[in-house]
Every structure is written in structure tokens, then in C-alpha cells.
């Protein structure tokens, strides 16, 4: 085998792989987290919803889940562990006698919805 053939064969394989890579990546599902519009921040059943992020689901579904989460909470100091098939965890911070802020993460399979809210007590 000539030296030219030995050197050019691996290069041809690399070129073919490089040509196919963009099409393989284009078929991969997008699961990037996106920021969703809150709209009327007081329409969720809590004092103020500050932000909503969705991954693997639509913003419309994320807003619906946030409303269901706050409907599930029994009162201002209540918590909701699961809603609409999602498992939810909550971390409260900036606590005072008048209010607290909270970060909530709800997950189901590859879908995740995160939101933050302020609750006056």
C-alpha cells in the first residue's frame, strides 16, 4: 500500500464523520431551559410570582403547573410535595415576620419547572 493511501484513508473517514455530525445534532431534542413570561404576577394564588423557567415542557404548561402548585398549598405557610404528576421541592429564604421568598422546583421525568415567589404572611 502506498504512503499516500495510508495517510488519506483516515482523513476520508474523519471528513465523512464531520459531514454527518451536524445532521445528527439537528435531530437531538432540545431540552434547554427557557425563561417564561409571568404575566400578572398576582394571578397565581400567592402574593407575587417573580420568575418561571421551563425545561422539557411549554411555558403555557409551566404557568398552569405553578397555579396548580399554589392551589395545592394549604395556606400561606403550607407546602405542596406533588402536583399534576410532578414532584416538587421548595427552599424558603429571606424570611421575616411579614414575608418570605421561595424557590420551587417541580420535576417529572425529563420535564422541570422552576419558579420563585414572594409570600406575605
Positions of predicted regions on the chain:
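C-terminal region of N-terminal signal peptides and the immediate post-cleavage residues
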Residues: 18-34
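Extracytosolic low-complexity repeat regions of secreted or lipid-anchored proteins
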Residues: 64-121
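Extracytoplasmic low-complexity, Pro/Thr/Ser/Ala/Gly-rich segments
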Residues: 29-66, 74-92
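Bacterial N-terminal signal peptides
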Residues: 10-19
